Swiss-Prot record:
It comes from the Eukaryota. GO terms for cellular component: late endosome membrane; lysosomal membrane; Mon1-Ccz1 complex. Component of the CCZ1-MON1 RAB7A guanine exchange factor (GEF). Acts as a positive regulator of CCZ1-MON1A/B function necessary for endosomal/autophagic flux and efficient RAB7A localization. Belongs to the RMC1 family. It comes from Homo sapiens (Human). One of its GO terms (biological process) is regulation of autophagy. This is Regulator of MON1-CCZ1 complex. InterPro entries: RMC1, RMC1_C, RMC1_N, WD40/YVTN_repeat-like_dom_sf, WD40_repeat_dom_sf. It is found in: Lysosome membrane; Late endosome membrane.
Length: 657
């Protein structure tokens, strides 16, 4: 399989830590994404590494027994260590605070601590087999204050740091889940919900395993993912992932079912809002996108993998350290190893090899694996780093070898402009709210974020269309049809078309002598009026004489002042067009000769300068009986320039009757 076929990869620079062994215990904290390597209970050192840490944190602590759990508070201010089932020890890592350990025992009698979670830099939750205890840590006093507690029988727990929600498994079957949400010193109990277990043989008692549950944020919403190894319907084979949506308000609801169509050992990750399901037996993974259209049965949506199953891209472990000799080749990493442990959203840890990776999605290979361009666009537009890939898809579908049909091209343009319009509307609403002074009264008002899915006209023009029209092998009718399709799409979404797109159409029509089509486009207002467009038409007069009148009509429709039209034309170096225009409206006797001579000189076209100079000499002769310029016209430097280029004899002689 070529590299172009793998759509999942492990990050290039993993976090490296000391491998797990009888002396070295490895722990992972999913809130800070840190790996702790604890040697000999901490007596011979603890090394903490995170994905962004340039410098790992190293320290020692007394060996007071086996470490069950170890985590820093957010911002690494306070260390918490659990060594017994009754207590958690704390140590401050704040400058000027005492480094002496202090201890907190769980409040509930006869309860055993299952674990703990930091919810902020000074707030911590103990989860016991009899409930949950929420504390504030007071580092300067070296003590804890109980903020709130709740009693219930707990089998196991799970924490989602992104949304600060803890899920507790209760009841004998372990399948009733009780969520709690934490925020700034408050603990809120959310409605509990039941996970539907698959039907099991009478002899075995079904129960919900912690291994089969994950929590993750997908498209900004919190979901509980349940890996159901057997479908609830007996006629369906294979496992499935059931997604329960857990809102901040209201009850949890089953929303999506991801069909795996296979059985065996699975693991889940979430990357770039995609659910990734790894299958150990086949050593492959599949991805699901819940935003793509699925099959809706009235209550849940069923989804199939977006793409065929593929392995994660083979990974070479880089050789580092003193043993790294140039002749040694990198060691291939065993993918889908039984020692792999996955954490949400996108983390894979190999404790036996001493690596922590982030899983990543590669978009380029997906382009060739998803032939349906409409579905491909729906998929790509939801991805974080999609812009350049989408532009390459657009270029590809307009290439000679992979040319798409016009209806497909239209669909792609419509999908792009749908996103573009959404962003423009959001920007406009924000601007209006700011203007109305709502930003002060509503602190929640945020400027819309421009994601990579917003491809505006300049992106499409620069990266796709301008190169496309240059292709000599393309039939010109197809080129024009594509340009018009993009303009149609912009109009359909009520997006003002930028003049450079109209210019591209006109230049292409002129290049192929399709003047009748140009005339029709202008006559029926397929091309919107604009000053730059009118100037372009004026410049085409020598190829297509009616362009002059079409241009003037357009400028009149735009209620443009005549002197403004002249200024626009001169700024575009359309000196002859400006002169023709001013003659056409009978204003040529009053115009400034100097302004026109300046513009003609700037073009560095000597023959153009000659023509303009001669025109004004003739005007002077007609109006004043002499071709010479008066001192008030300030044309001395132009007369000198004319003499320098063409000689004195080229000046007009006064004619006498």
């Amino acid at each position: 399989m070529g590299e172009e076929d793998y759509y999942l990869e492990l990050c290039e620079r993993p976090v490296q830590f000391e491998k797990a062994n009888p002396v070295n215990c490895v722990f992972f904290d999913e809130a800070n994404k840190q790996v702790f390597a604890v040697r000999s209970g901490g007596a011979t050192g603890v090394v903490v590494k995170g994905p962004d840490d340039r410098n790992p944190i190293s320290f020692r602590m007394d060996d007071k027994g086996e470490v069950k759990c170890i985590k820093f508070s957010l911002e690494n201010k306070i260390l918490a260590v659990q060594r017994t089932s009754k207590t958690v020890d704390f140590c401050n890592f704040i400058p000027d605070n005492s480094q002496l350990e202090y201890t907190q025992e769980c409040k509930t009698k006869n309860a055993n601590i299952l674990g703990f979670c930091w919810t902020s830099s000074t707030e911590i939750v103990f989860i016991t087999d009899q409930g949950i205890e929420f504390y504030q840590v007071l580092p300067e006093k070296r003590s804890l204050k109980l903020l709130k507690s709740h009693n219930l029988n707990v089998n196991w727990y799970m924490y989602c740091p992104e949304s600060a929600v803890i899920l507790l498994s209760t009841t004998v079957l372990e399948n009733v889940l009780q969520p709690f949400h934490f925020r700034a010193g408050t603990m809120s109990k959310l409605p509990k919900f039941e996970i539907e277990l698959p039907a099991a043989p009478k002899s075995t008692k079904p129960s919900l395993s912690e291994r089969d549950i994950a929590m993750a944020t997908i498209y900004g919403q919190l979901y509980v993912l349940f890996l159901r190894h057997h479908s609830r319907t007996s006629n369906s084979t294979g496992a499935e992932v059931v997604l329960y949506h857990l809102p901040r308000e209201g009850a949890c609801k089953k929303m999506h079912i991801l069909k795996l169509n296979r059985t065996g050992k699975f693991a889940l990750n979430v990357v770039d809002n995609l659910v990734v399901v790894h299958h150990q037996d086949t050593e492959t993974s599949v991805i699901f996108d819940i935003k793509l259209r699925g099959e809706f049965d009235g209550s849940v949506t069923f989804h199939h993998p977006v793409l065929p199953a593929r392995s994660i891209q083979p990974y070479q472990i880089p050789i580092t350290g003193p043993a790294a000799v140039t002749s040694q080749s990198p060691v291939p990493c065993k993918l889908y190893s039984s020692s792999w442990i996955v954490f949400q959203p996108d983390i894979i840890i190999s404790a036996s090899q001493g690596y922590l990776w982030n899983l990543q999605v590669k978009l380029e290979p997906i382009v060739n694996l998803l032939p349906d361009k409409g579905r491909l666009m729906d998929f790509l537009l939801q991805r974080k780093e999609c812009k350049m890939v989408i532009l390459s898809v657009c270029s590809q579908m307009l290439s000679e070898s992979d040319r798409a049909s016009l209806p497909v091209i239209a669909t792609v343009f419509d999908k792009l402009n749908h996103e573009y319009k959404k962003y423009l509307d959001a920007e406009q609403s924000y601007a209006m709210a700011v203007e109305a002074g709502q930003s002060r009264s509503s602190p929640l008002l945020k400027r819309p974020v421009r994601t990579q899915a917003v491809l505006d006209q300049s992106d499409v023009y620069t990266h796709v269309l301008s190169a496309f029209v240059e292709k000599k092998e393309m039939p010109h009718k197809f080129v024009i049809a594509v340009l018009m399709e993009y303009i149609r799409s912009l109009n359909q979404f009520q997006i003002a078309v930028q003049h450079y797109l109209h210019e591209l159409v006109i230049k292409t029509l002129v290049q192929h002598n399709l003047f009748y089509m140009l005339h029709q486009f202008l006559q029926y207002h397929v091309l919107s009026d604009s000053k730059p467009l009118a100037c372009l038409l004026l410049s085409l007069e020598s190829f297509y004489p009616p362009a002059h009148q079409l241009s003037l009509d357009m400028l009149k429709r735009l209620s443009t002042a005549n002197d403004e039209i002249v200024e626009v034309l001169l700024s575009k170096h359309q000196v002859l067009a400006a002169l023709r225009f001013i003659r056409g409206i009978g204003g040529h006797d009053n115009i400034s000769a100097r302004k026109f001579l300046d513009a003609a000189k700037q073009t560095e076209d000597n023959m153009l300068f000659y023509t303009i100079f001669r025109f004004f000499e003739q005007r002077n002769q007609r109006l004043r009986g002499s071709p010479n310029f008066t001192p008030g016209e300030h044309c001395e430097e132009h007369v000198a320039f004319f003499k320098q280029i063409f000689g004195d004899q080229a000046l007009m002689r006064p004619t006498t009757f």
